[in-house]
Amino acid sequence: METAASFDLPDERVWVVGDLHGNAGWIQVLLPAMRRHDPSLRTILQLGDYGFDHAQPGTGPVDYWAKRAGIERVLVTLGNHEEWNHITAAQEHVPGMAFRVSDVVWLLPRPFRFKIAGREVLSLGGASSVDKAFRTAGKDWFEDELITEQMEADAVAGGPADLLLTHESPASAAPEVQLLLTNNPHEFPPEALAVSAAQRARVQRVSDATLPHLHMHGHMHVYGDLEREDRRTVVSLDRDTFPGNAGVLDLATLAFNPLALNEIRS
């Protein structure tokens, strides 16, 4: 197993992609669109619910389309809907290390720090499943999904970061995320929402301690952004097949430009 204690990448611009949920059909549309938009980009930062299980056959679409798009690496900040039954054991074998699961895909530990174009990047994967009541423990739900107190402490101990990547939303989230949480359109049970709120508070504490200029997350299945009074920005990416699932991040300015859905599907 190939591992890495960190990365130091020269890329001036990278792709950032939200939830994918193992959707091979979306991959074979999205990655060619990325190449059409800008064939010079080499890195994808994926924000969790990646959903492709590289311990099983049939996960070739990511490597296949990434190579054709000129993508050399996909760095995954893990989400809640992942194959934790395989991932946890692998992480325990190489604690604190990113490990490679395919030609281009790396799964990042929690937390993990690396650099892109001199920027300090902090990745902290994990989140709560508000649909836990409709899932089966050990089959499609795993307690390992949660961000722990130790993970929070380790993330904070590393000091400030320029860019924070999480799957879970912070408590201080984009208006679109706040509206979703207020309305609870899927009528998730109160106990699940309480765990979710605790996880968001944990992420917020990490953000407030590390003071990233930009915090990007997935999980909420809605695109939106928030520019805080302290000039820190939070961006929520939508899920596969929806607008705002992917875009280009400029490391010099930390400006994010989403790839339009009509450009992806053209």
Regions found by a protein language model. Give the residues of each.
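Conserved catalytic scaffold of divalent metal-dependent phosphoesterases
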Residues: 67, 77-192
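Active-site environment of divalent metal-dependent phosphoester hydrolases
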Residues: 21-25, 51-56, 80-88, 113-115, ...
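Catalytic-core regions built around general acid/base machinery
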Residues: 61-71, 198-209
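Active-site neighborhood of phospho(di)ester-bond hydrolases with catalytic His/Asp-centered motifs
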Residues: 16-18, 44-49, 73-81, 107-109, ...
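Binuclear metal-dependent phosphoesterase catalytic core
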Residues: 8, 115-117, 208, 221-266
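Core catalytic region of metal-dependent phosphoesterases/phosphodiesterases
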Residues: 2, 7-10, 17, 24-116
